[in-house]
UniProtKB/Swiss-Prot annotation:
GO biological process, one term: response to herbicide
Residue positions binding [CaMn4O5] cluster: D170, E189, H332, E333, D342, A344
Locations listed in the record: Plastid, Chloroplast thylakoid membrane
Modification sites for Phosphothreonine: T2
Binding-site residues for a quinone, renumbered to this chain: H215, S264, F265
Protein name: Photosystem II protein D1
Binding site for chlorophyll a ChlzD1: H118
Length: 353
C-alpha cells in the first residue's frame, strides 16, 4: 500500500505575523495593542531621555522668557524637566513639520507635546494589552480595570487639564521639581486640598498602602507549622517553594481577635477584591476631581464664613489655606501678568490681620 503525503501549503507572511502577534507562547506577549504600544512608548522614552539631557530652554509662558529644563543647560536630576509646550502654541497640534525650523520647535516646547501624546497612546494600549492577554488566557478582565486608575490620573494631568485651561503650557512638567511646581500652582488656582474627590484619593492611596502592608505581613506570618514547637517555624520551609504555606483561617482568627470579628475577611476573593478596589476607586475619584477642576469647578472655599454675633470674622484653618493660596498665586508666572486673577478683582479679599 502506498501512502501519498501532500505538503501543506505554506501560510502567507501576514498569517504568520498574525499568529506571532496573538501567540501566548511568546516570552513577552505582543498582542494587537502591543503593535501600537511598543513604538509609541519607545518614542516617548527616547525623546524624553534626549530632551532631558540636551533640550534648549523653552518659552513656556509665551512671553519670550525661556525656562531651562535639561541637564546640559545647568539642571540636575531634581531640578531638570521636560518643559511644557509654550502658551503661544496653546492647544494647537504642534508636530515638527508645523514649525519653521527644528530650533523654533524646540524653543516652543514641541518635545513635551510629542512625549505626552505618545505616552498617552502607549499607556492606553498597555491597558488594552492587559485585557487582550487576559481574554486569550480565559481570565477575567479586572487587571486592566485596576490599571485604568493610573491611566485616568495621567490622562487628567497631561490631557484633560491642558484642554480645560486652554493650553498645553498648563500641563504637568515631566520632572521632579516641575511636578512639585504643578502641585503648588494647582493648589493656588483650584484649592485642590479642599476638594472632596482629592480627599477620597488620599484615603485611597494611604489606605491602600496600609491594607497592603497589613495583608502582606499577615500572610507572611500565618504559616502552617511543619516543625515541632522546639524548632523555628521557618525551618519547615524553603524560600520560593510551591506548596501552600498560608492558612487563611489562622489569619482570620488572629485579625478577628486583634480588632473585632467582622473586621477580618474569611473569604480570600472578597479580601483581594477589597485590596484592589480601595486604591483604584480612590484614584478614579482624584482623576475625576482633576478633570472637573480643569474647567474651574474648584475645591471648597468657605470665604471667611465663620463670624461672631457682631459680624466679625473668626479665622479657621480654611482661611489660612486661602491666604497661602494667594501667596502662591502671586509668586507663580511672575512676569506673565500684572496681577493674579484673585487679586485683580474689584474688591480686595479681607485677611483680617
Amino acid at each position: 500500500m502506498t501512502a501519498i503525503l501532500e505538503r501543506r501549503e505554506a501560510s502567507s507572511l501576514w498569517a504568520r505575523f498574525c499568529e506571532w502577534v496573538t501567540s501566548t507562547e511568546n516570552r513577552l506577549y505582543v498582542g494587537w495593542f502591543g503593535v501600537i504600544m511598543i513604538p509609541t512608548l519607545l518614542t516617548a522614552v527616547s525623546v524624553f531621555i534626549i530632551a532631558f539631557v540636551a533640550a534648549p530652554p523653552v518659552d513656556i509662558d509665551g512671553i519670550r522668557e525661556p525656562v531651562s529644563g535639561s541637564l546640559l543647560y545647568g539642571n540636575n536630576i531634581i531640578s531638570g524637566a521636560i518643559i511644557p509646550t509654550s502658551n503661544a502654541i496653546g492647544l494647537h497640534f504642534y508636530p515638527i513639520w508645523e514649525a519653521a525650523s527644528v530650533d523654533e520647535w524646540l524653543y516652543n516646547g514641541g518635545p513635551y507635546q510629542l512625549i505626552v501624546c505618545h505616552f498617552f497612546l502607549g499607556i492606553c494600549c498597555y491597558m488594552g494589552r492587559e485585557w487582550e492577554l487576559s481574554f486569550r488566557l480565559g481570565m477575567r478582565p479586572w487587571i486592566a480595570v485596576a490599571y485604568s486608575a493610573p491611566v485616568a490620573a495621567a490622562t487628567a494631568v497631561f490631557i484633560i487639564y491642558p484642554i480645560g485651561q486652554g493650553s498645553f503650557s498648563d500641563g504637568m512638567p515631566l520632572g521632579i521639581s516641575g511636578t512639585f511646581n504643578f502641585m503648588i500652582v494647582f493648589q493656588a488656582e483650584h484649592n485642590i486640598l479642599m476638594h472632596p474627590f482629592h480627599m477620597l484619593g488620599v484615603a485611597g492611596v494611604f489606605g491602600g498602602s496600609l491594607f497592603s502592608a497589613m495583608h502582606g505581613s499577615l500572610v507572611t506570618s500565618s504559616l502552617i507549622r511543619e516543625t515541632t514547637e522546639n524548632e523555628s517555624t521557618n525551618a519547615g520551609y524553603k524560600f520560593g517553594q510551591e506548596e501552600e504555606t498560608y492558612n487563611i483561617v489562622a489569619a482570620h482568627g488572629y485579625f478577628g481577635r486583634l480588632i473585632f470579628q467582622y473586621a477580618s475577611f474569611n473569604n480570600s476573593r472578597s479580601l483581594h477584591f477589597f485590596l484592589a478596589a480601595w486604591p483604584v476607586v480612590g484614584i478614579w475619584f482624584t482623576a475625576l476631581g482633576i478633570s472637573t477642576m480643569a474647567f474651574n469647578l474648584n475645591g471648597f472655599n468657605f470665604n471667611q464664613s465663620i463670624v461672631d454675633s457682631q459680624g466679625r470674622v473668626l479665622n479657621s484653618w480654611a482661611d489660612i489655606i486661602n491666604r497661602a493660596n494667594l501667596g502662591m498665586e502671586v509668586m507663580h508666572e511672575r512676569n506673565a501678568h500684572n496681577f493674579p486673577l484673585d487679586l485683580a478683582s474689584v474688591e480686595a479679599p479681607s485677611i483680617n490681620g
